[in-house]
C-alpha cells in the first residue's frame, strides 16, 4: 500500500449531515471529547443524544482544576453540563476510555451501529490504508481517532509547508498547538507526488480552519502510537450490518482489531482525554 495517487482526494462522507451537525455542535464541552463524537454520530443517525448521556454511559470521570490548561490556544472553557458529572479524586483517575466510547455508541443506538476498534500497527502507510479501506467498504462510517496531540503539526501551517510535503520535500514541522490525549475524527486524505496529508476534523473551531486541519500521515501515525506508555487507536463506527465486512477487510490487511489502553480503563483511572 503506497498511499493515494498523486493529485487524488479521498473523503469519508460519514452519515447524512454529519459535517453540518459537527459545525453546529462545536466546541465540545470540557473533557468530553470522546462523548462529543459519540453524541454527534448518534444524532446523525437519528438518535438525538447529548454529550453528557454518552459520557455517563462511557464511564467518563472529570478531572478537577483549571480547564484552561487542557484547552488548545484560543479556546474558552465550556462547562454547561446538563447533568452533574462525576469528578475524580485525583488527575490519575480521570478520563474516558475508548472502549467506553464504543460501548456507549453501540448501546445507545440500540444495536443499530457497530464499532470496529483498530489498535494498529501504526505507520504512514497503515493510516492511509485504514482510510481507503473504510471509505471503500463502509463509506458512511466515522473514524474516531484516539491519539496524543503533541505529535501532530500545528494546525495552521503556512500553505507552502503543506505543498512542500505533498511534493516530498523536507520541511520543518510547525510546533503542535497542544499536547494531551484527545478524540477527533479522520475525514479523508490528500495525495501528492511525494507525500500524503490526512484530513482531520476536530472538536474546536480554533484548530485549523473551522475545526479542520491537514496533517502528514506519518504525524498521525506517531500521534496514534503516542510514545508515552499508553496506546491509541481508531474506532471505526458504521451501521451494524457493515461492521462485519469492514472488520474482515481490516483484518485481511493485518490490522489489529481490539480495544486499547489509553490510560483510562472505562473511566476508572488514567490519562486525561480532553
What are these regions (language model features)?
Residues 124-201:
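Active-site-adjacent substructure of cysteine-protease-like catalytic cores
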Residues 68-69, 162, 215-219:
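Short, charged/polar low-complexity linear motifs in solvent-exposed/disordered segments
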Residues 40, 149-152, 205-206:
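Solvent-exposed loop/turn segments at secondary-structure junctions
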